[in-house]
């Protein structure tokens, strides 16, 4: 899969920090805020656990964790509240690329380094407005889901319904498009 702006993917295994680099990061005394689109499921809890564990190993203090309940206006409010604490890093999944863009822009302009998961705000340029976007191979997940569905339906086939999620969410569209194409 390509990224939201057509970026070529890189596996997480390509990111390796030396002991010296980790020591420098720890010396920074950096802080992070985790601004989720939704936190009420196993996937979000697993992501949060992974982020908190890795930040702790790197000496980065997590000063805030929010759950917008998939409401853009709540996420904007969360970002505004968090910025009063001046985090060095914000890891986030934007609920709506357009409705949240100004709040993310304000956070970046205030000096927070932005790392996105799965979705980016409208008009944001990689490497300029944000550090990175991380995601699974969602197109590949859609292909795999289609093959699993075909196997479950058996050789005689059958009918299945595919529900389109109308929210402007990059990775959901990737999975949907891949499932349909397969």
Regions found by a protein language model. Name each.
Residues 1-182:
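A residue-level marker of the well-folded mature domains of exported/periplasmic proteins
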């Amino acid at each position: 899969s390509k990224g939201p702006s057509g970026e070529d993917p890189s596996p997480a295994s390509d990111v390796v920090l030396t002991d010296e680099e980790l020591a420098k990061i720890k010396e920074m005394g950096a802080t992070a805020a985790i601004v989720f689109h939704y936190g009420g499921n196993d996937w979000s809890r697993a992501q949060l656990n992974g982020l908190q564990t890795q930040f702790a190993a790197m000496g980065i203090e997590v000063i805030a964790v929010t759950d917008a309940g998939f409401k853009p206006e709540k996420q904007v409010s969360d970002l505004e509240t968090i910025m009063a604490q001046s985090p060095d890093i914000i890891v986030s999944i934007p609920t709506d690329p357009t409705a949240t863009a100004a709040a993310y822009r304000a956070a970046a302009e205030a000096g927070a380094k932005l790392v996105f998961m799965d979705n980016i705000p409208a008009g944001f340029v990689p490497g300029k407005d944000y550090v990175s976007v991380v995601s699974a191979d969602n197109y590949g997940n859609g292909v795999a889901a289609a093959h699993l569905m075909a196997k479950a339906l058996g050789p005689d086939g059958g009918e299945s319904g595919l529900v389109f999620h109308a929210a402007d969410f990059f990775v959901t569209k990737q999975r949907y498009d891949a499932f349909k194409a397969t």
